[in-house]
Amino acid sequence: MQQSQRGCGQNSYGQSGYRQRGFTLLEIMVVIVILGVLASLVVPNLMGNKEKADRQKAVSDIVSLESALDMYKLDNNRYPSTEQGLKALVTKPTVQPEPRNYPADGYIRRLPQDPWGTDYQLLNPGQHGKLDIFSLGPDGMPGTEDDIGNWNLDKK
């Protein structure tokens, strides 16, 4: 018997006798283009949802802080001063006017930060009402249009 010139056990499909499988460069490029198109459609929608979620978290935090401040006022017949700030809800203020009926564990466990990593602010008296509780918003600057406060919680 004569062996073929290709050698023992070899054929046109490779050494193992099976056809080699895989994706061509063109197929891989088509998949990458499709993924890019899908990403360009989805990412802008997700970014808009993040902004809405951040705003909603700030609104929720401000409403919670308002409730805690109302409890503070019920116990002490006044809100904390601007100088005492929202920290007066966590620990008893030592700055005048000191509260007379302050609970041992405060009114809240800890102060939340707004979604942009900034502390919420308290103004007493407020510029928009009796008391202003607000976030400086995404830009972190006071007095700008993106501030979120208890005076504009319904704004979208």
UniProtKB/Swiss-Prot annotation:
Supply the name of the protein: Type II secretion system core protein G
The record describes its quaternary structure and partners as:
Type II secretion system is composed of four main components: the outer membrane complex, the inner membrane complex, the cytoplasmic secretion ATPase and the periplasm-spanning pseudopilus. Forms homomultimers.
- Which family does this protein fall into? Belongs to the GSP G family.
Pfam families cross-referenced by the UniProt entry: N_methyl, T2SSG
The transmembrane segments are 23-43
InterPro entries per the UniProt record, alphabetical: Bac_GSPG_pilin, N_methyl_site, Pilin-like, T2SS_protein-GspG_C, T4P/T2SS_Core, Type2_sec_GspG
Topology relative to the lipid bilayer, per the entry, is:
Single-pass membrane protein
- Propeptide positions: 1-22
Domain of life (superkingdom): Bacteria
Q: Tell me which GO cellular component terms the UniProt record holds.
A: plasma membrane; type II protein secretion system complex
Protein species of origin: Pectobacterium carotovorum subsp. carotovorum (Erwinia carotovora subsp. carotovora)
The record's section on NCBIfam families has: IV_pilin_GFxxxE, typeII_sec_gspG
Is the keyword DNA-binding in the record?
A: no
> Which keywords describe this protein according to UniProt?
Cell inner membrane, Cell membrane, Membrane, Methylation, Protein transport, Transmembrane, Transmembrane helix, Transport
- Kindly list the organism's lineage: Bacteria, Pseudomonadati, Pseudomonadota, Gammaproteobacteria, Enterobacterales
* Encoding gene per record: outG
